[in-house]
Amino acid sequence: MKYKLFPLILCITLFSCQLQKKGNASTPIKEVDICIYGGTSAGVIAAYSAKKMGKSVLLVEPGKYLGGMTTGGLGATDIGNKYAVTGLARLFYRRIGEHYNKFEQWTFPPSVATATMNRFVKDADLDVLYYRRITDAQVQNKRIESITLEDSRQPDEETLIQVKAKQFIDCSYEGDLMAKAGVSYFVGREGNEEQDETLNGVQMSFWHQFPDGVDPYLKEGDPNSGLCWGIQPNTLKERGSGDKLVQAYNFRLCLTDNKENQRPFEKPENYDPAKYELLARAIRKMDLHID
Protein backbone atom coordinates (compact mmCIF):
# COMPACT_ATOMS: atom_id res chain seq x y z
CA MET A 1 0.00 0.00 0.00
CA LYS A 2 1.34 3.43 -0.91
CA TYR A 3 0.90 6.65 1.03
CA LYS A 4 0.89 9.97 -0.76
CA LEU A 5 2.71 12.80 1.00
CA PHE A 6 3.09 16.42 0.00
CA PRO A 7 6.63 16.90 -1.40
CA LEU A 8 8.79 19.90 -0.65
CA ILE A 9 11.48 21.26 -2.97
CA LEU A 10 14.77 19.30 -2.76
CA CYS A 11 13.69 17.02 0.08
CA ILE A 12 10.64 15.71 1.86
CA THR A 13 10.36 16.04 5.59
CA LEU A 14 8.43 13.29 7.28
CA PHE A 15 7.52 13.46 10.96
CA SER A 16 7.60 10.42 13.15
CA CYS A 17 5.48 9.25 16.03
CA GLN A 18 5.48 6.30 18.44
CA LEU A 19 7.93 3.53 17.52
CA GLN A 20 6.63 0.32 15.95
CA LYS A 21 8.85 -2.67 16.69
CA LYS A 22 10.73 -4.00 13.66
CA GLY A 23 13.55 -6.51 13.22
CA ASN A 24 14.98 -8.82 15.86
CA ALA A 25 15.54 -7.85 19.46
CA SER A 26 19.32 -7.64 19.02
CA THR A 27 19.16 -4.92 16.35
CA PRO A 28 20.95 -1.84 17.73
CA ILE A 29 18.76 1.26 18.00
CA LYS A 30 19.85 4.88 17.66
CA GLU A 31 17.45 7.60 18.74
CA VAL A 32 17.75 11.26 17.72
CA ASP A 33 15.61 14.31 17.10
CA ILE A 34 16.36 14.46 13.38
CA CYS A 35 17.68 11.77 11.02
CA ILE A 36 18.89 12.93 7.61
CA TYR A 37 19.33 10.31 4.91
CA GLY A 38 21.85 11.19 2.22
CA GLY A 39 25.18 12.97 2.67
CA THR A 40 24.71 15.27 -0.31
CA SER A 41 25.33 19.01 -0.03
CA ALA A 42 21.70 19.40 1.03
CA GLY A 43 22.13 16.65 3.62
CA VAL A 44 25.26 18.14 5.17
CA ILE A 45 23.79 21.64 5.35
CA ALA A 46 20.48 20.37 6.75
CA ALA A 47 22.36 18.44 9.44
CA TYR A 48 24.59 21.43 10.19
CA SER A 49 21.57 23.72 10.54
CA ALA A 50 19.65 21.35 12.79
CA LYS A 51 22.64 20.77 15.07
CA LYS A 52 23.29 24.50 15.38
CA MET A 53 19.64 24.86 16.45
CA GLY A 54 20.29 22.53 19.36
CA LYS A 55 18.80 19.32 17.97
CA SER A 56 20.35 15.88 18.18
CA VAL A 57 21.13 14.85 14.61
CA LEU A 58 22.22 11.73 12.74
CA LEU A 59 23.45 12.06 9.15
CA VAL A 60 23.32 8.78 7.20
CA GLU A 61 25.40 8.30 4.04
CA PRO A 62 25.22 5.03 2.02
CA GLY A 63 28.74 5.57 0.65
CA LYS A 64 32.00 6.94 2.01
CA TYR A 65 31.92 10.53 0.73
CA LEU A 66 29.98 13.60 1.77
CA GLY A 67 28.93 16.48 -0.47
CA GLY A 68 27.41 14.70 -3.44
CA MET A 69 28.13 16.28 -6.80
CA THR A 70 29.65 19.36 -5.16
CA THR A 71 32.60 17.32 -3.89
CA GLY A 72 32.41 14.71 -6.64
CA GLY A 73 33.68 16.84 -9.51
CA LEU A 74 30.97 19.39 -10.29
CA GLY A 75 33.29 22.29 -9.57
CA ALA A 76 31.71 24.90 -11.85
CA THR A 77 28.67 26.41 -10.18
CA ASP A 78 25.67 27.43 -12.29
CA ILE A 79 24.66 30.44 -10.24
CA GLY A 80 23.31 32.99 -12.72
CA ASN A 81 23.32 36.05 -10.48
CA LYS A 82 25.63 35.41 -7.52
CA TYR A 83 23.65 37.85 -5.36
CA ALA A 84 20.79 35.37 -5.39
CA VAL A 85 22.96 32.95 -3.37
CA THR A 86 22.55 33.61 0.35
CA GLY A 87 22.66 31.87 3.70
CA LEU A 88 24.79 28.78 4.24
CA ALA A 89 25.25 28.26 0.50
CA ARG A 90 26.98 31.63 0.33
CA LEU A 91 29.04 30.72 3.39
CA PHE A 92 30.22 27.59 1.58
CA TYR A 93 31.51 29.58 -1.40
CA ARG A 94 33.15 32.12 0.86
CA ARG A 95 34.90 29.36 2.76
CA ILE A 96 36.11 28.03 -0.58
CA GLY A 97 37.39 31.54 -1.23
CA GLU A 98 39.39 31.47 2.01
CA HIS A 99 41.44 28.61 0.59
CA TYR A 100 42.52 30.86 -2.28
CA ASN A 101 42.85 34.02 -0.15
CA LYS A 102 39.84 35.47 -1.92
CA PHE A 103 36.49 36.77 -0.71
CA GLU A 104 34.58 34.01 -2.49
CA GLN A 105 35.21 31.35 -5.11
CA TRP A 106 32.70 29.72 -7.47
CA THR A 107 34.93 27.16 -9.19
CA PHE A 108 37.00 24.61 -7.30
CA PRO A 109 38.46 21.07 -7.40
CA PRO A 110 36.90 18.19 -5.43
CA SER A 111 39.66 18.22 -2.80
CA VAL A 112 38.94 21.80 -1.74
CA ALA A 113 35.18 21.22 -1.79
CA THR A 114 35.60 18.08 0.35
CA ALA A 115 37.74 19.88 2.91
CA THR A 116 35.19 22.70 3.09
CA MET A 117 32.27 20.29 3.49
CA ASN A 118 34.12 18.38 6.21
CA ARG A 119 34.65 21.69 7.99
CA PHE A 120 30.87 22.06 8.33
CA VAL A 121 30.75 18.56 9.81
CA LYS A 122 33.54 19.34 12.28
CA ASP A 123 32.19 22.76 13.27
CA ALA A 124 28.83 21.27 14.23
CA ASP A 125 30.33 18.06 15.66
CA LEU A 126 27.97 16.03 13.49
CA ASP A 127 27.34 12.34 14.05
CA VAL A 128 27.75 10.70 10.62
CA LEU A 129 27.04 7.08 9.74
CA TYR A 130 28.93 6.08 6.60
CA TYR A 131 28.20 2.98 4.50
CA ARG A 132 24.63 2.72 5.77
CA ARG A 133 21.82 2.03 3.31
CA ILE A 134 18.09 1.93 4.01
CA THR A 135 16.34 -1.42 3.78
CA ASP A 136 12.99 -0.61 5.35
CA ALA A 137 10.90 2.20 6.80
CA GLN A 138 8.41 1.57 9.59
CA VAL A 139 5.36 3.75 8.86
CA GLN A 140 2.20 4.19 10.87
CA ASN A 141 -0.65 6.59 10.10
CA LYS A 142 1.34 8.02 7.18
CA ARG A 143 4.26 8.94 9.45
CA ILE A 144 7.72 7.43 9.62
CA GLU A 145 8.45 5.99 13.03
CA SER A 146 11.84 4.44 12.33
CA ILE A 147 14.07 3.19 9.54
CA THR A 148 16.28 0.14 9.25
CA LEU A 149 19.78 0.44 7.81
CA GLU A 150 22.25 -2.15 6.57
CA ASP A 151 25.97 -1.97 5.93
CA SER A 152 26.23 -1.26 2.19
CA ARG A 153 29.59 -3.08 2.09
CA GLN A 154 28.26 -6.20 3.83
CA PRO A 155 24.46 -6.30 3.55
CA ASP A 156 23.19 -8.92 5.98
CA GLU A 157 21.05 -9.05 9.12
CA GLU A 158 24.11 -8.92 11.36
CA THR A 159 24.82 -5.35 10.27
CA LEU A 160 21.30 -3.93 10.71
CA ILE A 161 20.75 -0.73 12.68
CA GLN A 162 17.41 0.84 13.53
CA VAL A 163 17.05 4.61 13.79
CA LYS A 164 14.19 6.32 15.59
CA ALA A 165 13.69 10.04 15.11
CA LYS A 166 11.09 12.74 15.59
CA GLN A 167 11.78 13.92 12.07
CA PHE A 168 13.26 12.32 8.94
CA ILE A 169 14.62 14.22 5.94
CA ASP A 170 15.43 12.55 2.63
CA CYS A 171 18.37 14.38 1.05
CA SER A 172 19.49 11.54 -1.20
CA TYR A 173 19.54 12.02 -4.96
CA GLU A 174 17.59 8.80 -5.50
CA GLY A 175 14.84 9.38 -2.93
CA ASP A 176 15.24 5.90 -1.43
CA LEU A 177 13.85 6.91 1.96
CA MET A 178 10.74 8.33 0.35
CA ALA A 179 10.29 5.19 -1.74
CA LYS A 180 10.66 2.90 1.29
CA ALA A 181 8.12 5.04 3.13
CA GLY A 182 5.57 4.46 0.39
CA VAL A 183 5.68 7.87 -1.25
CA SER A 184 4.47 7.66 -4.85
CA TYR A 185 7.12 8.41 -7.47
CA PHE A 186 7.78 8.40 -11.19
CA VAL A 187 10.87 7.00 -12.91
CA GLY A 188 11.93 8.92 -16.00
CA ARG A 189 10.49 12.22 -17.14
CA GLU A 190 6.82 13.05 -17.07
CA GLY A 191 5.12 14.32 -20.18
CA ASN A 192 3.51 17.74 -20.33
CA GLU A 193 0.04 16.23 -20.17
CA GLU A 194 0.61 14.75 -16.69
CA GLN A 195 0.41 18.10 -14.88
CA ASP A 196 -0.75 20.37 -17.71
CA GLU A 197 2.73 21.91 -18.07
CA THR A 198 4.87 23.10 -20.97
CA LEU A 199 8.50 22.30 -20.12
CA ASN A 200 8.35 18.61 -19.19
CA GLY A 201 9.35 15.59 -21.24
CA VAL A 202 11.37 15.71 -24.44
CA GLN A 203 12.76 19.18 -25.12
CA MET A 204 14.51 20.46 -28.24
CA SER A 205 17.51 22.22 -26.74
CA PHE A 206 19.27 25.04 -28.53
CA TRP A 207 22.31 24.83 -26.28
CA HIS A 208 25.03 22.26 -25.61
CA GLN A 209 24.66 20.65 -29.01
CA PHE A 210 27.19 19.05 -31.33
CA PRO A 211 28.44 21.40 -34.04
CA ASP A 212 26.81 20.97 -37.43
CA GLY A 213 28.38 18.47 -39.78
CA VAL A 214 29.79 15.85 -37.40
CA ASP A 215 29.67 12.61 -39.38
CA PRO A 216 27.83 9.83 -37.46
CA TYR A 217 29.14 6.83 -39.41
CA LEU A 218 31.99 4.50 -38.51
CA LYS A 219 33.52 5.20 -41.88
CA GLU A 220 32.92 8.87 -42.52
CA GLY A 221 30.54 9.40 -45.42
CA ASP A 222 29.51 5.72 -45.58
CA PRO A 223 26.04 4.95 -44.08
CA ASN A 224 26.60 1.25 -44.74
CA SER A 225 29.50 1.14 -42.26
CA GLY A 226 27.18 1.56 -39.27
CA LEU A 227 26.89 4.20 -36.57
CA CYS A 228 29.64 5.35 -34.24
CA TRP A 229 29.56 4.09 -30.67
CA GLY A 230 26.97 5.94 -28.58
CA ILE A 231 24.59 6.87 -31.38
CA GLN A 232 21.14 5.32 -31.25
CA PRO A 233 19.13 4.76 -34.44
CA ASN A 234 15.86 5.59 -32.66
CA THR A 235 13.48 8.23 -33.94
CA LEU A 236 13.31 11.35 -31.78
CA LYS A 237 10.11 11.43 -29.76
CA GLU A 238 7.56 14.22 -29.90
CA ARG A 239 8.33 17.41 -27.99
CA GLY A 240 6.83 17.30 -24.49
CA SER A 241 6.31 13.54 -24.45
CA GLY A 242 7.41 11.48 -21.46
CA ASP A 243 9.43 8.28 -21.12
CA LYS A 244 10.89 5.90 -18.55
CA LEU A 245 14.52 6.80 -19.18
CA VAL A 246 16.89 8.26 -16.59
CA GLN A 247 19.91 10.50 -17.03
CA ALA A 248 23.26 8.95 -17.78
CA TYR A 249 25.87 8.75 -15.03
CA ASN A 250 29.40 9.89 -15.69
CA PHE A 251 32.73 10.56 -14.05
CA ARG A 252 34.11 14.08 -13.84
CA LEU A 253 37.74 15.06 -13.71
CA CYS A 254 39.74 18.24 -13.30
CA LEU A 255 42.15 19.40 -16.01
CA THR A 256 44.66 22.21 -15.76
CA ASP A 257 47.10 24.12 -17.94
CA ASN A 258 49.34 24.68 -14.91
CA LYS A 259 52.35 22.45 -15.56
CA GLU A 260 53.16 22.15 -11.86
CA ASN A 261 49.73 20.70 -11.10
CA GLN A 262 49.52 18.34 -14.06
CA ARG A 263 49.65 14.57 -13.70
CA PRO A 264 50.11 12.08 -16.56
CA PHE A 265 47.14 10.13 -17.89
CA GLU A 266 47.49 6.36 -17.62
CA LYS A 267 45.84 4.25 -20.29
CA PRO A 268 43.08 2.17 -18.62
CA GLU A 269 42.78 -1.55 -19.14
CA ASN A 270 40.42 -2.50 -21.99
CA TYR A 271 40.56 1.06 -23.34
CA ASP A 272 38.49 1.33 -26.52
CA PRO A 273 39.23 4.48 -28.57
CA ALA A 274 36.12 3.84 -30.69
CA LYS A 275 34.01 4.99 -27.74
CA TYR A 276 35.51 8.47 -28.06
CA GLU A 277 35.44 8.85 -31.82
CA LEU A 278 32.48 11.24 -31.71
CA LEU A 279 34.32 13.43 -29.20
CA ALA A 280 37.39 13.56 -31.44
CA ARG A 281 35.27 14.51 -34.44
CA ALA A 282 33.46 17.22 -32.47
CA ILE A 283 36.80 18.67 -31.32
CA ARG A 284 38.05 18.75 -34.88
CA LYS A 285 34.84 20.36 -36.13
CA MET A 286 35.02 23.07 -33.45
CA ASP A 287 38.68 23.63 -34.36
CA LEU A 288 39.78 23.13 -30.76
CA HIS A 289 43.41 22.48 -29.93
CA ILE A 290 44.78 20.64 -26.91
CA ASP A 291 48.51 21.09 -26.33
Where are these regions (language model features)?
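Bacterial Sec-dependent N-terminal signal peptides
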Residues: 1-29
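Flavin (FAD/FMN)-binding glycine-rich loop and adjacent Rossmann-like elements that form
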Residues: 25, 155-167, 171-291
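Beta1/beta-strand and adjacent pyrophosphate-binding region of the FAD-binding site
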Residues: 27-40
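Glycine-rich, N-terminal phosphate-binding loop of Rossmann-like dinucleotide-binding domains
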Residues: 39, 151, 172
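N-terminal Rossmann-fold NAD(P) dinucleotide-binding loop
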Residues: 43
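Conserved N-terminal/central alpha/beta ligand/cofactor-binding core
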Residues: 49, 55-56, 61-140, 186, ...
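Residues that flank catalytic or metal-binding motifs in active/ligand-binding sites
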Residues: 130, 143, 245-249
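Conserved beta-strand-loop-beta-strand element in the redox core of flavoprotein oxidoreductases
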Residues: 138-162
